[in-house]
């Protein structure tokens, strides 16, 4: 007879969070599982894992994006460009388990992973990354 716990899934036990791979030229502590794009007007979806202490430098993306925090805690700082370089734009934003964050296309931001994070990341159309240092 199956136990009730045999029917339960969490982000620790679900196959959804397996088969992640490292990607060259990305921060240490980052792994991802991606989908296969089949629609040029579709969305790029990634299941991301970030180790606590990992940071992404200021960057932007060509499309709007949405991040859903499945597990963990992270922060985002927005920036604007000035003649002196990048200047923080507003206060740092924190996203916790269960939170959803949206970032407009082209908006410069960083990301810091305060705790181990599992994220569902959705990018409008094909994903792109532009370093803004």
Where are these regions (language model features)?
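Ligand-binding loop in jelly-roll beta-barrel domains
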Residues: 97, 102-130
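Conserved short histidine dyad/triad with adjacent acidic residue
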Residues: 44-61
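Short beta-strand segments in beta-sandwich/barrel cores
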Residues: 55-57, 72-78, 100, 127
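A short, N-terminal "cap"/entry segment at the start of jelly-roll beta-barrel domains
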Residues: 1-47, 92-93
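Glycine- and acidic-residue-biased ligand/ion/polar-headgroup-sensing regions
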Residues: 62-83
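Short acidic-glycine-tyrosine-enriched beta hairpin
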Residues: 81-105
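A cytosolic small-molecule/anion-sensing beta-strand core signal
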Residues: 47, 70-71, 115
């Amino acid at each position: 007879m199956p136990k009730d716990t045999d029917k339960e899934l969490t982000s620790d036990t679900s196959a959804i969070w397996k088969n992640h791979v490292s990607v060259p030229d990305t921060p240490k502590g980052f792994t991802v599982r991606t989908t296969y794009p089949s629609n040029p007007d579709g969305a790029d979806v990634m299941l991301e894992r970030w180790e606590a202490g990992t940071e992404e430098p200021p960057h932007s993306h060509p499309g709007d994006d949405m991040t859903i925090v499945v597990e963990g805690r992270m922060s985002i700082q927005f920036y604007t460009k000035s003649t002196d370089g990048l200047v923080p734009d507003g206060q740092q934003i924190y996203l916790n388990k269960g939170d959803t964050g949206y970032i407009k296309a082209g908006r410069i931001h960083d990301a810091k992973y305060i705790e181990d994070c599992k994220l569902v990341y959705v990018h409008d159309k094909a994903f792109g990354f532009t370093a803004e240092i």
